[in-house]
Amino acid sequence: MPVSDSLSPDLPNDDTSEEWLEVGTIVGAHGLNGEVKVYPDSDFPERFTQPGLRWLVSPTEASTPEEIQLIRGRFVERKGIYVVKLANVNFRDQSEALKGTKLLVRSNDRPTLAEGEYYLSDLIGVTVVDHQTQAVVGSVVSLASAGNDLLEIQLDNTTKTILLPFVSALVPIVDIATKRIEITPPKGLIPE
């Protein structure tokens, strides 16, 4: 059901105060010619394989995202990462220096989703309500990937969280516009 691209409002904004989407993290160098390994935070492979503009920002220092050209990229299935070539990164020491750097796109560069698909950033903070009783259960705090995606819901008035498979049988209504999700939890999942 959900699709990831992490909205990063805490990243520095440029003078137009736009938001950025974090699509991956550079986790190391690959080879001697400046390629980098990118761990994806996006379900859209074109973020890493199609040439075009991307932005880099260091997680350790407050900085403005820097524009960079993505030249090419490929998926390494057995490792679950992308190997990407960036413009003007031609040597291993340059690519090693980028370790930990976040790869970004502009928030207005979101692909259109199919019905029943949602951006993870749109789900975080949404109020969760019991479909039958209309009682507030809590709010979405995260999404865990497993066989099915699992909504992590922080229960109302507590720090306890529960995991609920994000499938239509258990999550019949998702209304992003009103920031409300209705669930039909299995008996015993939510403490009384």
Curated annotation (Swiss-Prot):
It is found in: Cytoplasm. The keyword Chaperone applies. GO terms for biological process: ribosomal small subunit biogenesis; rRNA processing. Keywords: Chaperone, Cytoplasm, Ribosome biogenesis, rRNA processing. Residues 115-189 form the PRC barrel domain. GO terms for molecular function: ribosome binding. GO terms for cellular component: cytoplasm; ribosome. Its main location: cytoplasm. The keyword rRNA processing applies. InterPro entries: PRC_barrel-like_sf, PRC_RimM, RimM, RimM_N, RimM_N_sf, Transl_B-barrel_sf. It holds the Pfam family PRC_RimM. NCBIfam families: 16S_RimM. Binds ribosomal protein uS19. An accessory protein needed during the final step in the assembly of 30S ribosomal subunit, possibly for assembly of the head region. Essential for efficient processing of 16S rRNA. May be needed both before and after RbfA during the maturation of 16S rRNA. It has affinity for free ribosomal 30S subunits but not for 70S ribosomes. Belongs to the RimM family. PANTHER family: RIBOSOME MATURATION FACTOR RIMM. The PRC barrel domain binds ribosomal protein uS19. This is Ribosome maturation factor RimM. It comes from Acaryochloris marina (strain MBIC 11017). The lineage of its organism: Bacteria, Bacillati, Cyanobacteriota, Cyanophyceae, Acaryochloridales. The gene is rimM.
